[in-house]
Design a protein with these regions (language model features):
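C-terminal active-site rim and adjoining tail of enzyme catalytic domains
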Residues: 5-8, 85-163
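Metal-dependent phosphodiesterase/phospholipase catalytic core, i.e.
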Residues: 1-82, 102, 124
Length: 163
């Protein structure tokens, strides 16, 4: 456990997942940050996957990362069917599909610049997540485009628009 200057404790991954495991309806999304060294990314992924397996949480976990290297490592090392999304926005749907990625999890600006990517992802059988969509007109646009997941800081407005 890491103790902050203000006295708060930062839990380890295992400690956090043990608490989260009790929330049985909660889908767990883990973002792996980009490292300067690919070897560290691989070792981190191995640790993450071992911890998730130990706690029997594989079916509830999804992984997201800005690192293309980490996406490929998660796909290589995780059990088949594990959801892995790429965040960086610089890879088209066909390449994501070819790599075995579940789909893109791209910033709103990426999909606004490439609106055809949403339909293409769906044609390829992938899921689409977009972030961070806070304006009602943008929410409506992504609802109409049938984005599978919309990340927002204003969920009440999004829920109202989805009715």
């Amino acid at each position: 456990v890491l103790k902050l200057e203000n006295g708060e404790n930062v839990p380890s991954l295992e400690q956090f997942l043990k608490v989260a495991k009790k929330k049985t309806r909660l889908k767990l999304i883990l973002e792996l940050k980009v490292y300067d060294n690919p070897e560290w990314e691989t070792k981190s992924i191995e640790y993450i996957l071992a911890t998730v397996k130990k706690l029997k949480l594989q079916r509830r976990m999804e992984y997201i990362t800005f690192s293309w290297y980490s996406v490929q490592e998660f796909i290589r090392l995780a059990p088949k069917g594990t959801s892995v999304y790429y965040l960086n926005g610089d890879i088209p749907p066909e390449k994501l599909k070819e790599a075995g990625c579940t789909g893109p999890d791209y910033h709103i600006g990426v999909f606004r610049s490439h609106p055809d990517w949403i339909d293409k992802c769906h044609e390829l059988g992938m899921k689409v997540n977009v972030w961070t969509v806070d304006q009602p007109h943008d929410m409506k646009w992504f609802i109409e485009k049938k984005a599978d997941f919309i990340t927002t800081d204003d969920p009440v407005v999004l829920q109202q628009l989805m009715k």
